Structure formats: structure tokens, C-alpha cells
UniProtKB/Swiss-Prot annotation:
Quaternary structure (record): Component of the 30S ribosomal translation pre-initiation complex which assembles on the 30S ribosome in the order IF-2 and IF-3, IF-1 and N-formylmethionyl-tRNA(fMet); mRNA recruitment can occur at any time during PIC assembly.
Chain ranges of the S1-like domain: 1-72
Protein role: One of the essential components for the initiation of protein synthesis. Stabilizes the binding of IF-2 and IF-3 on the 30S subunit to which N-formylmethionyl-tRNA(fMet) subsequently binds. Helps modulate mRNA selection, yielding the 30S pre-initiation complex (PIC). Upon addition of the 50S ribosomal subunit IF-1, IF-2 and IF-3 are released leaving the mature 70S translation initiation complex.
SMART domains named among the record's database cross-references: S1
Major subcellular location class: cytoplasm
Alphabetized UniProt keyword annotations: Cytoplasm, Initiation factor, Protein biosynthesis, RNA-binding, rRNA-binding
Protein name (Swiss-Prot/TrEMBL): Translation initiation factor IF-1
Gene: infA
Pfam families per record: eIF-1a
Organism name: Streptococcus suis (strain 05ZYH33)
Length: 72
């Protein structure tokens, strides 16, 4: 999938799940299941409940996403 096809939106981590999965509440009120992107995993960036994050969503499945950035 091309990089231009993704939808980027900010949200807040609500819950943590096994296998580096998180429930993220988006700005518009929807909740999505998000995984951690490879660069965040590689650099050992910790994501905790309450963190503000940027999530990439595919236009084909708006219920799952990828966390690409954690705000400080």
C-alpha cells in the first residue's frame, strides 16, 4: 500500500493488550485497535495508558491502525 493512502489522526491510549496492541480513542470519539510500528519497537519507545499518539489508518479497514508517533 502506498504511503499516501493512509489516514493520520491523533488519539489517546485507553488500554493496553498483549502483543504490543493498544486501544486508542481518536479525536472524533471512535476507538481503534492499534499496533506499534517497527521504528517505535526497534527504538524501545514505551507507550503507556494516557499517552497521546499519532495513528495511521488504512482506508480499507478503519478499525485497526498503526501507532507511528508518541508525543512527549
Amino acid at each position: 500500500m502506498a504511503k499516501e493512502d493512509v489516514i493520520e489522526i491523533e488519539g489517546k491510549v485507553v488500554d493496553t493488550m498483549p502483543n504490543a496492541m493498544f486501544t486508542v480513542e481518536l479525536e472524533n470519539g471512535h476507538q481503534v485497535l492499534a499496533t506499534v510500528s517497527g521504528k517505535i519497537r526497534k527504538n524501545y519507545i514505551r507507550i503507556l495508558v494516557g499517552d497521546r499518539v499519532t495513528v495511521e489508518l488504512s482506508p480499507y479497514d478503519l478499525t485497526r491502525g498503526r501507532i507511528t508517533y508518541r508525543f512527549k
